[in-house]
């Protein structure tokens, strides 16, 4: 009997990951059977865990916190997206045995905004809140959609300015944000502790979409604040999660899943 194609997600912690359910839905669309497991790698043991997985028949892997930068250094070659982001969330085993690193986070975000939420990015003004790895990973793809302007705001200005210089966008301290934006994206992790970014409510007055890159309860504080402050539409990051997973699946298998029914399936869980 032929073994099923094996995939995984590496993280620490990783027990909460919804990736196995998402990828099994993609496999149903393709009409194939796959194995997809969560692997909690020890801090300091990521490289060995990856080597063991691929050495025992693994075909592809997703990578989540805190290993995305380490995965970047582990990969033998990189996509342009991964090089720009400096982080890898997808590892692909090539026919020559080498590992190729890619970053599909930006694709997941942009596809959710443009295809599922039906809001164009081209010609729009975008405010990014936060300057960590999550934000850095999505800037290259957002720029490909040719927005009129991207502004990055962070509590510590130096980190925002570093990304602004790297990607040719604007930076401001979070407390100094003013003016209306079409799309406001929260890439901070404060919602996990019930906190919202220190921004004035009037920036949401002409906001077509307020988006939090996290999903579920952690997104609620920011999205509630945005809605109460005038944002026309709000969304958490579930669509981004499904979208980046679909892009990974396509890289591994050459089959592009339809993300809409999978988003609805995950909402109903």
Curated annotation (Swiss-Prot):
Its EC number is 1.1.1.25. InterPro entries: Aminoacid_DH-like_N_sf, NAD(P)-bd_dom_sf, SDH_C, Shikimate_DH, Shikimate_DH-bd_N, Shikimate_DH_fam, Shikm_DH/Glu-tRNA_Rdtase. It holds the Pfam family Shikimate_dh_N. The active site is at residue 68. Keywords: Amino-acid biosynthesis, Aromatic amino acid biosynthesis, NADP, Oxidoreductase. It catalyses: shikimate + NADP(+) = 3-dehydroshikimate + NADPH + H(+). Shikimate binds at residues 17-19, 64, 89, 105, 215. It is an enzyme of class 1 (oxidoreductase). One of its GO terms (biological process) is chorismate biosynthetic process. The keyword Oxidoreductase applies. Homodimer. Involved in the biosynthesis of the chorismate, which leads to the biosynthesis of aromatic amino acids. Catalyzes the reversible NADPH linked reduction of 3-dehydroshikimate (DHSA) to yield shikimate (SA). This is Shikimate dehydrogenase (NADP(+)). The lineage of its organism: Bacteria, Pseudomonadati, Pseudomonadota, Betaproteobacteria, Neisseriales. The gene is aroE.
């Amino acid at each position: 009997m032929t073994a099923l194609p094996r995939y995984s997600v590496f993280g620490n912690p990783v027990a909460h990951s919804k990736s196995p359910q998402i990828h099994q839905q993609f496999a149903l669309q393709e009409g194939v059977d796959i194995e997809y497991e969560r692997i909690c790698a020890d801090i300091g043991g990521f490289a060995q865990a990856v080597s063991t997985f691929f050495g025992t028949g693994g075909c592809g892997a997703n990578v989540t916190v805190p290993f995305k930068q380490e995965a970047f250094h582990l990969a033998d070659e990189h996509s342009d997206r991964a090089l720009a982001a400096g982080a890898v969330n997808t590892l692909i085993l090539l026919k020559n045995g080498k590992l190729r690193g890619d970053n599909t986070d930006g694709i997941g975000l942009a596809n959710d905004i443009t295809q599922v939420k039906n809001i164009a990015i081209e010609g729009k003004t975008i405010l990014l809140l936060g300057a960590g790895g999550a934000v850095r990973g999505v800037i290259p793809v957002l720029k490909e959609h040719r927005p009129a302007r991207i502004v990055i705001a962070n509590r510590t200005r130096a980190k925002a300015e570093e990304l602004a210089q790297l990607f040719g966008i604007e930076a401001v301290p979070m407390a100094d944000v003013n003016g209306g934006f079409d799309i406001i994206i929260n890439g901070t992790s404060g919602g996990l502790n019930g906190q919202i970014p220190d921004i004035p409510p009037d920036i949401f007055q002409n906001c077509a979409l307020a988006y939090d890159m996290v999903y579920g309860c952690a997104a609620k504080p920011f999205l509630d604040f945005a809605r109460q402050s005038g944002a026309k539409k709000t969304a958490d990051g579930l669509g981004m999660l499904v979208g980046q997973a679909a892009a990974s699946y396509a890289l591994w298998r050459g089959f592009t899943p339809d993300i809409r029914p999978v988003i609805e399936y995950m909402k109903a869980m």
